[in-house]
Every structure is written in structure tokens, then in C-alpha cells.
Amino acid sequence: MASSKFVLFAILALSLLLSGTEARKTVWPSSELDPKCCSNQPEFGICDSKEDDERCAQMCLDGCPTNKGGGCQPITEAPGAVCSCYCA
């Protein structure tokens, strides 16, 4: 009787844990990365507000299989900031 309750509890707990997981592609270091990964994205345009920073982070999450996000980063080559997708 006690073991059947334990099994039922274990299955319920496992189901709850797995229901919140999100599938993302895994990229191994030796594999080829998408061009958006680890680079500046000048085609993003102006990147100078919090909304732009959030939009940049989402674009990098959606477009780069490393799933590290991104943000508006100042660069020396141009005034202002540019969207940059993170590597690590």
C-alpha cells in the first residue's frame, strides 16, 4: 500500500517538473553557429533605450541557438550602441 502511494507521488512530482521545461536546441562548441551568434547586429538599427535592449535580447534568443541573449553594447567604431548577441 505504501509503495503504491510512493510511486504515484513520484510520477506526479516528475510530471510537474517536466511540465515546465522548455525545449531549446543545444549547440556543441565544435558545431557551426548561426551568423547572429557572437556578433554585432548593425541591421537591428538604433539601440539606445531599454525597449531596444529588450528587443535586441529577444532577437538574439530567437535567432541564435546558443540561447545566451544579447543587449545594446557601445562600440568604438560608431557613436551610440549596437545590438550584440552574446556567446557565453
UniProtKB/Swiss-Prot annotation:
Question: Using the chain's own numbering, where are the disulfide bonds?
Answer: C37-C87, C47-C72, C56-C83, C60-C85
A single Gene Ontology CC annotation of this entry is: extracellular region
User: What GO biological process terms does the UniProt entry carry, in alphabetical order?
Assistant: defense response to fungus; killing of cells of another organism
Q: Which UniProt keywords apply?
A: Antimicrobial, Disulfide bond, Fungicide, Plant defense, Secreted, Signal
Q: Name one Pfam family in it.
A: Defensin_like
| InterPro entries to which the protein is assigned, alphabetical | Defensin-like_20-28 (IPR022618)
Compartment list: Secreted
The UniProt similarity line reads: Belongs to the DEFL family.
UniProt name for this protein: Defensin-like protein 24
**What does UniProt list as this organism's lineage?**
Eukaryota, Viridiplantae, Streptophyta, Embryophyta, Tracheophyta
